Structure formats: C-alpha cells, structure tokens
C-alpha cells in the first residue's frame, strides 16, 4: 500500500512540476515571443529536472507539460473570453499581468480538457503555482476565477 501511495505522490509531484514549467513557458512565449518548438526544446533540455541559477527544478512529466502548453496555444482564442467572463468587471484579461494570464490560461485549459484530473485538484495546483509568482490577493483571484471556470466545465463534480 505504501508503494502505491509513493507512486501516486511521485506522479503528482511530476505533474506539479510540469504545471509550473508550463506557466513559465507560456509566460516566456508571450513576453519574449518564443515559438512553441523553441520553448519545448529549451525547457526539456535545460529546465525540467535541472538546476538553473541555483534553483533545483523537479523532474516534470514532459508529456503533460507539452499537452498543457500546446493546448493553451491551440485554444487561447477560445479560452481568453471564458477567462474574461469569470474576471471582475473592469478587469479584462489584457489588463492582468502576463504571468497571471499564463496561470489562468493553463488552469482553464486543464479544467476543460484534462478530465483525468479532478477539478478541485486542478484549481488547487494552479493556486499553488500562482503562489510561486504573485502576491496573496492575486492568488485569491486565481482561485475564484478557476473555481468559476471549473463549475462551468465540470458542474457534475461540484454537485456531489
């Protein structure tokens, strides 16, 4: 039983690392104009599971990382209006910091497409990712926006 729990924890940690890397990659693509193939190559060879500038990055589930990044890029034109609808009036997505946009886009993509991960886990994981980059009050906004989007895509999970 302990071995099963360890394997689940390792997979969760690898996915958490993939989420963090996906948000960093999406941010880099938006700010630096990097292409998706360049970002994949850079992250997979230099970041995932490596030490960069004194920070040790956990090994990440590369396929999960690729899925989230590619999915956000593919679906961004459809995801952005959904996020805009969930944001407070007067705060359109374009007014929000780029790293926060990356967190919300990645979380929204995963809520819509990764049904293998419970909605509450997705929201919690991206709140944790947000803590790595942004202030406390903005983390609350990430929680509220992703919770609203989760209820839209996965209402059945919240009816229980």
From Swiss-Prot:
Belongs to the NusB family. PANTHER family: ANTITERMINATION NUSB DOMAIN-CONTAINING PROTEIN, N UTILIZATION SUBSTANCE PROTEIN B-RELATED. One of its GO terms (biological process) is transcription antitermination. This is Transcription antitermination protein NusB. GO terms for cellular component: cytosol. Involved in transcription antitermination. Required for transcription of ribosomal RNA (rRNA) genes. Binds specifically to the boxA antiterminator sequence of the ribosomal RNA (rrn) operons. Keywords: RNA-binding, Transcription, Transcription antitermination, Transcription regulation. GO terms for molecular function: RNA binding. The keyword Transcription applies. It comes from Nitrobacter hamburgensis (strain DSM 10229 / NCIMB 13809 / X14). It comes from the Bacteria.
